[in-house]
Design a protein with these regions (language model features):
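Glycine-rich, flexible N-terminal cofactor/catalytic loop recognition
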Residues: 1-61
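A contiguous loop/helix-start segment that scaffolds small-molecule binding in enzyme catalytic cores
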Residues: 5, 80, 159-241
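Short active-site oxyanion
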Residues: 29-35, 107-111, 158-160
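Alpha-helix capping/helix-boundary segments
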Residues: 41-43, 88-89, 118, 168, ...
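Conserved helicase motor
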Residues: 57-65, 138-143
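Glycine/small-residue-rich loop that forms an oxyanion/phosphate-binding "nest" at active or ligand-binding sites
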Residues: 68-117
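Class I SAM-dependent methyltransferase SAM-binding "motif I" and its flanking Rossmann-like core
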Residues: 98-156
Length: 241
């Protein structure tokens, strides 16, 4: 294996099945001077699977402002840092983008080692149109903010991809059904894992299904089909939901 050029390596990791790690990703993690990750416990399971001994540093929302300058300085000093998240592509719904941004501003070498993505995997498996799509991450836990976001995107003619928390799934599906209309959608849970589950149907059907089922567990992706002739509802109607 050839030595790495000093810089920041943004490395995708498996979203569930550890066997999905790419060969290049394994090589970069082995050769890097340091791995910056969200949860060291999660990342060490992956490293153990592939006998990787590289130093690990925790980098997450609560310490990012302190750790980020240290990582950038290490690269400036000639080091190589691999950035990973708990699952999937770093900087998607995590603080990774700020490290990438600041590294670029500092004139450092930045490259990506692609791989698994829960959002894209969910879109493909949903069976919904893939030619145009919009990824929105997690909707707000606050009801009104969540509805406002859904209102803003209600007329977009593209498949919509969300990450969702099991605690909020039913409420989010209810809001989607009322505001986006009864579009076709899919709820994808525990992708690539032993208990992978895909439920497809209209938003109304999915809302009813999960409202009368035990609370789901694990990581969830919701994909909603494109808008067609979406009937708008008034603010008064929304407030009664």
């Amino acid at each position: 294996m050839s030595p790495l050029e000093c810089g920041l390596y943004v490395v995708a990791t498996p979203i569930g099945n550890l066997g999905d790690m790419t060969l290049r990703g394994i090589e970069v993690l082995m050769l890097a001077d340091r791995i910056a990750c969200e949860d060291t416990r999660v990342t060490r399971k992956l490293l153990s699977r592939y006998t990787i001994k590289t130093k690990v540093t925790s980098y997450h929302d609560h310490n990012a402002n302190t750790v980020r300058p240290v990582l950038i300085q290490e690269i400036k000093n000639g080091g190589t840092v691999a950035l990973v998240c708990d699952a999937g592509m770093p900087s998607i719904s995590d603080p990774g983008y700020k490290l990438i941004r600041d590294s670029i501003v500092a004139g450092l070498y930045v490259t990506v080692v692609p791989g698994a993505s829960a959002g894209l995997s969910g879109l493909v498996l949903s069976g919904l149109p893939t030619d145009r799509f919009l990824f929105l991450g997690y909707l707000s836990s606050k009801s009104q903010q969540r509805r406002n976001t859904l209102e803003e995107i209600s007329g977009i003619s593209a498949s919509l991809i969300f990450h969702e928390n099991p605690e909020r799934l039913v409420r989010s599906l209810k809001d989607m059904s009322f505001i986006l209309g009864d579009r076709q959608a899919a709820v994808l849970r525990e992708l690539t894992k032993l208990h992978e589950e895909v439920c497809r149907g209209s938003l109304n059907e999915l809302w009813a299904h999960y409202a009368h089922s035990a609370k789901p567990k694990g990581e969830i992706v919701v994909v909603v089909g494109p808008a067609k002739d979406v009937e708008k509802i008034s603010d008064k109607e929304i407030s009664t939901i």
